[in-house]
Amino acid sequence: MKKRMVVLMASAAMMMLSGMTVSASENLDNVVDTSYGKVQGINSTDEGYENVVQFKGVPYAAPPVGDLRWKAPMDHEKWDDILVCDTNREMPMQELGFVEPSGTDFHNNTAPEMSEDCLYLNISTTEENLTGDEKKPVYVWFHGGGLTVGHTYSAEGNLDAFAENDVIAVSVEQRLGVFGYLSLPQLSEEQGQSGNYGLMDQIKALEWIKENIANFGGDPENITVGGQSGGTTKATTMIASPKMDVDVDKLILESGLKYVGAFQSQEDAEKNGTAYLEDLGLSADISMEELRAMDGEELLKSASEHYPGRMNQDGLYVAYPSIQEAVNEGVFDDVSILSGANMGEGQYLQTPTADEF
């Protein structure tokens, strides 16, 4: 198996960031101001999308590494030069056994590398919309894979097709699995609650989009959110969150409305997290200092029945016991919803036929 890059130190992340900048005296095509600094996109090389400008790997929060592991996302440090956003960033940390069988076609002929430094988003717009006065609708898309696997640059997330049709399209990476949804008594003691870090990332991303998308040609007052499979869970739970301050009144939910099933209670989530530590051979009362110092790959054990991958009703980010209850309480009454089912949904869970091998 190809060795995967795992970036764990914030200092290393900042070194990588500085290495991606260019001076202000060089090419200034497709340069956009953001709240953190200037970013530069590239023209798409895909046939039929030559007018599309892509911004790949735009930071929306500080790398959640080191002392920021299992904490709410923080603002990114500002930069002075131009950040060239021409390359897909590493996907969030996850068990690759669920990702690799889908093949390189699904991953747009890439071999996904992974990193805890994953709080980036991608934007597709057009040259005309970058410079025009009329602001266009915005679509924010969340990938599938439950809350444990996946990434934004798989074949299912074709942002350029939206951009070509005058929609400013955005896809968002967020923490997954043990890095996004671990709940522990010692974490709750530290923060008042624990888990739901991936959901916190989503909300942080929407706040960044609201603040900055106009500079990419998007209308911050006309944002639609959607997702595929597990992305529908992300989208609906985010809209129902009391912490979600960005107004969104349109949802596109591919592969169903996630209205069934209750969230874990905070207590049950903490018990599950403690059991997961024991599955890893760790003491249940290990300190957060020790946990945050561990290598990220040592924390991955998705075969465990206790692997963290569910949101919990913490009373702060998740207030309702289920999305169904949020629907019953009228949370979605003013939200227009387009829903359908995707061909091949859940196919990786099925046993392939001989012809499919």
List where the protein language model places each region.
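Non-catalytic accessory segments of hydrolases
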Residues: 22-196
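Alpha/beta-hydrolase fold nucleophile elbow
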Residues: 216-228
